[in-house]
């Protein structure tokens, strides 16, 4: 083989790992992440897997872009042997047959009824869907998409979740939810890893009496929940304060999984009231990427991939809310210098009076 190329092979197939696949440089060019583990894993999966599993990300409604917003997610999916693709349902008219999962990541515009029919047909055939929804204000109302999720057992609230009981620093809309027990989350719980969901909307389970389905054919389980102190803010024009007349009281659910029995097959869904938790600058927070990748493994039946992944080196950044930034500014630029100035004046006066 060519210099710098590794080859893994069996008696029937072979896969090459190129030198450029072993390192992934940041856009600054200053730091390289070692991606050899993912590259060799991808090669081995290709050797021993008959059919590659494709993960399709929906486009056409202002969703997150794989190359720009979700490149770290794409890298992890590629590294674990998945094939990532984009699909515009308005042009294809259907979900591709080879799709193992269809990801709807933060749509800003609603789906047409024809697109909804295509997704429902995919689910009826035992497909898997991950719907990640931003709160109202970051996206338009999504009546068609919400109705489709409602038919699968999940209701979507038009609110912004505020949680004084568990949040990131001083940002009460940056929720760090409690993790419920499930195959997807059990290792997160064991390792005491949290997830961080900045600016979320709440979800709820549709009662069986509201829809005509057999309760035994569908199961809906919560994964992420707020504390009892949380509420779903519905008045976006004023400061966030709980109003029992219009706001949703806590605890609130931020993520569900749905399993729908379809005779010889199953449809599986992940619904999260947040799409930002997979953004490039947030996905490295503790358990965020593991939560999503474990969900992918659960939906595709790859139980061996449900684990805690090694972290790649990264620049540590501090994210400050407006209140935090003002606090840092006043303390470092005004309070501390003023304190030293007063101390100096006091020493000078004391020495002068001696």
Where are these regions (language model features)?
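Short, surface-exposed patches at the edges or C-terminal ends of soluble domains, predominantly
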Residues: 1-354
